[in-house]
A protein has these predicted regions:
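Domain-level signature for soluble enzymes in the chorismate/prephenate branch of the shikimate pathway
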Residues: 1-207
């Protein structure tokens, strides 16, 4: 009988995941600076991975089960079956802008930038969700129709609307406005980090 392959998240969900395992049926151990986790059940192989990667790895059959966030299941559109809400790491996906900006929502922001013929730049790790959200904004549909916002990464540019751009973030997204981008789409639990970086939430994309 082959081992059960179990992927667990590294990063913001890591500590809570280890507490969950330690309070369950098994002892947990690992060596520092390694991604291998050992349970006292020899039938389970555990590896720590980035939560962004886990949905697709489970969908492709490389792992039998994994722990990740709903945000990454939604973003990757992976063909997986959510089994249980573990009820930790409660976050929401939001749009935030500098607190000096007067826009009430992102729809108003799109309309104003289009009126002034300014390029609107948004930074996010969530490229799929960002593009979908923007295309569903009334002002975007009115001005740009069915055009796709331009998604910009270090290795790729896709989309046919350079007037609204989504820039891939590799983290510390809240640090990018206002010099590098005009807005961000990011996850937050309490909003404290956003406020500390002079940002305010104007839209909630997903809870």
């Amino acid at each position: 009988m082959s081992k059960v392959k179990f992927a667990i998240p590294k990063g913001s969900l890591e500590e809570a995941t280890f507490k969950l395992l330690e309070n369950s049926w098994t002892k947990v151990s690992r060596k520092s600076r390694t991604y291998r986790v050992f349970l006292d059940d020899p039938e389970i192989m555990v590896k720590m991975l980035r939560p962004q990667e886990i949905p697709n790895l489970v969908a492709d059959g490389l792992y039998d089960v994994g722990i990740t966030g709903k945000d990454w299941i939604n973003e990757t559109k992976s063909d997986v079956d959510p089994l249980l809400d573990l009820e930790y790491g409660k976050i929401k996906l939001v749009i935030a802008i500098p607190d000096t900006f007067k826009f009430k929502n992102f729809d108003d922001m799109i309309a104003e930038y289009a009126k002034k013929k300014k390029i609107l730049r948004l930074s996010s790790e969530y490229l799929t969700n960002a593009s979908k959200f923007i295309k569903n904004c009334k002002s975007y549909k009115k001005v740009f129709g069915n055009k796709d916002p331009m998604i910009i990464t270090p290795w790729l540019r896709v989309g046919n609307n350079k007037n609204v751009q989504i820039h891939l973030s590799f983290g510390a997204t809240e640090a990018k406005p206002p010099e590098d981008v005009d807005a961000i789409m990011d996850v937050t639990e309490t909003g404290t980090t956003l406020k500390q970086n002079g940002l305010k939430i104007i839209d909630t994309v997903m809870k």
